[in-house]
Amino acid sequence: MSQVYSVAVVVGSLRKESYNRKVARALSELAPSSLALKIVEIGDLPLYNEDVEAEAPPEAWKRFREEIRRSDAVLFVTPEHNRSVPGCLKNAIDVGSRPYGQSAWSGKPTAVVSVSPGAIGGFGANHAVRQSLVFLDMPCMQMPEAYIGGAASLFDDSGKLNDKTRPFLQAFVDKFASWVKLNRAV
């Protein structure tokens, strides 16, 4: 039997029916049997504060860090806010990286998908997330890049992914499966 890798999916939008959450669900459905994708919620994470860390870390921080630690890989799916990372996602990245020297992210293979209603597909957010991933020692898949624009047209009225977008997302998640296998073997 082949290895099944657990993938923590971190969605940078808090809206229940956001385009990013829909794309994350679609990727989960398209994932090959070697990947088990699970969305890790970030909406309940208090803002990171080192003073709070020193006194008593909130249970939500502990839960989040443990979910990331238990995963074999991480997939970020994010919108773009003001040409950068949404605050909730940056906070989750910070929470997972602390306390210093105990990052839950370290060494986990990763990829970034940005989804936007606009034409450039969240390019700014995608690259801002990647900057943090370099510092966090996360090997990030470089190709194919996933800047998905025109998010409103990706799904039909029933919420099903359209046939035009499916092949790209399928190729992306298949390549990510290979990336995870390659980098978890190191």
UniProtKB/Swiss-Prot annotation:
Transmembrane segments: none annotated. SUPFAM superfamilies: Flavoproteins. Optimum temperature is 80 degrees Celsius for chromate reductase activity. FMN binds at S13, L14, R15, K16, E17, S18, Y19, N20, E80, H81, N82, R83, S116. Optimum pH is 5 for chromate reductase activity. The keyword Oxidoreductase applies. It holds the Pfam family FMN_red. Non-competitively inhibited by sulfate. It is an enzyme of class 1 (oxidoreductase). It catalyses: a quinone + NADH + H(+) = a quinol + NAD(+); a quinone + NADPH + H(+) = a quinol + NADP(+); Cr(6+) + 2 NADH + O2 = Cr(3+) + superoxide + 2 NAD(+) + 2 H(+); Cr(6+) + 2 NADPH + O2 = Cr(3+) + superoxide + 2 NADP(+) + 2 H(+). Binds 1 FMN per subunit. GO terms for cellular component: cytosol. Its EC number is 1.6.5.2, 1.6.-.-. Its cofactor is FMN. The keyword tRNA processing does not apply. One of its GO terms (molecular function) is FMN binding. PANTHER family: CHROMATE REDUCTASE, NAD(P)H-DEPENDENT FMN REDUCTASE LOT6. Homotetramer. Dimer of dimers. The tetrameric configuration has a central role in chromate reductase activity. This is Quinone reductase. The gene is chrR.
